[in-house]
Amino acid sequence: MSHLDNGFRSLTLQRFPATDDVNPLQAWEAADEYLLQQLDDTEIRGPVLILNDAFGALSCALAEHKPYSIGDSYISELATRENLRLNGIDESSVKFLDSTADYPQQPGVVLIKVPKTLALLEQQLRALRKVVTPDTRIIAGAKARDIHTSTLELFEKVLGPTTTTLAWKKARLINCTFNEPPLADAPQTVSWKLEGTDWTIHNHANVFSRTGLDIGARFFMQHLPENLEGEIVDLGCGNGVIGLTLLDKNPQAKVVFVDESPMAVASSRLNVETNMPEALDRCEFMINNALSGVEPFRFNAVLCNPPFHQQHALTDNVAWEMFHHARRCLKINGELYIVANRHLDYFHKLKKIFGNCTTIATNNKFVVLKAVKLGRRR
C-alpha cells in the first residue's frame, strides 16, 4: 500500500493485483499528483471525466464530484472499486464506462492519463471531440519520457491548441483547448489478412499488436492442440486469433474468449462473426480479471499468452494470477498451454504451481510450455 496526500483528500492506495512486499509497486505516480494540483474545488463545473485511471488515484481523490472513470481495463475498474472501499468512499460515487461507450456531454473537466497505446489515445480523443466544449478544461498527464511530439500533435489534430508544462518529479502535463479543428473520419477498427488462411482479422484501438500478427502468437499457433473436446479457454484473448484457430482445429470443442479489455473481447467477437459465423454457438465471450468467479474444474484446456507488464510497469503479477486461476478452473488432467519470452523462466513458476511442466517447443526468443492438473494440491 502507498499513501497519496493531495488537495482533495488523503488516500491509502494499493495496486490490483497486489504486488509482493519484496518488490512493491506504487498504486499512483507523480503525474496523478501533478494533475490534481491543477484543480481547485471551486472551479469544477459540469461532469468530471477521468480517462485511464489505472488504480483509481484520481477517481478516489475527486469522488465527491461524482466523476466518470473511462478506460479499457476491467482490472483498473476493480482496482478503483477496491481503493474506494479501502478509503471508506461509497463505490457509487464513481460511474464506470468503457472506452467504446458514449461519453457524457459538456464535461467541465477532463483528466487523461496518457495510455501506452497511441491508437487508444486517438480513439478516446475522437470520442471526447463529440462532447467537449471550448470551456472544458482538458489536462493530460504522464511520465515526461512518455509524452512525445506525436502525442502533442495528436491532441492538436483532434481537439485543438495544445501546450505542455515543465517536468515535475519526472512527470509532464498537456493542456488542450477545444476549437474543433477539421478532422477526417477514421475507421473504428484496423484489419489485416491472416496469412495461410482466408480470415480477415479486425482490431479495435487497444488490442495488442493491432496492425499484424505478433511473433509470439505466430509461434504459438504452430503448436496448438488439436481434436480436444469440452470447453477450452483463450485466456487474455486479445483479438481472438488463438481462439479462432482453436475453433478450427477442435470442431467438437467450445472456446471461451476471456480478456480484461472490453476492446479485446469486442474484437474477438467480431472476428468470429466475420470469419467463422457458423462457430458462434460454440463460443462464449467474457470480460473478466483472468478467471475470477469462474467455477473450479470446468475446463479441459486453457491457452494463454500472458503479459509481463501492467500499463507501463514490468511485472509478472498478472501472469502469476492467470496461472493460479487456470489451475483452479481446469478439470483433473486438464492442460494449460502458454507461450512466453524465454527469459521470463515461466517453466519453474508453472512447475511450482502444477507440480509439472513440459517444454513443447522453443526458438531463440519464445518457448511453448504445457502443465497438467494432476489432482488436488494442498
From Swiss-Prot:
Pfam families for this protein: MTS (PF05175)
EC number(s) per entry: 2.1.1.174
CDD domains the UniProt entry points to: AdoMet_MTases
Keyword tags: Cytoplasm, Methyltransferase, rRNA processing, S-adenosyl-L-methionine, Transferase
Record-level Gene Ontology MF annotations: 23S rRNA (guanine(1835)-N(2))-methyltransferase activity; nucleic acid binding
Keyword Metal-binding: no
Predominant cellular place of this UniProt entry's protein: cytoplasm
Catalytic activity: guanosine(1835) in 23S rRNA + S-adenosyl-L-methionine = N(2)-methylguanosine(1835) in 23S rRNA + S-adenosyl-L-homocysteine + H(+)
GO CC term, one of those recorded: cytoplasm
Compartments where located: Cytoplasm
Record's function text: Specifically methylates the guanine in position 1835 (m2G1835) of 23S rRNA.
Family membership noted in the UniProt record: Belongs to the methyltransferase superfamily. RlmG family.
Entry-linked HAMAP family: 23SrRNA_methyltr_G
Official protein name in the record: Ribosomal RNA large subunit methyltransferase G
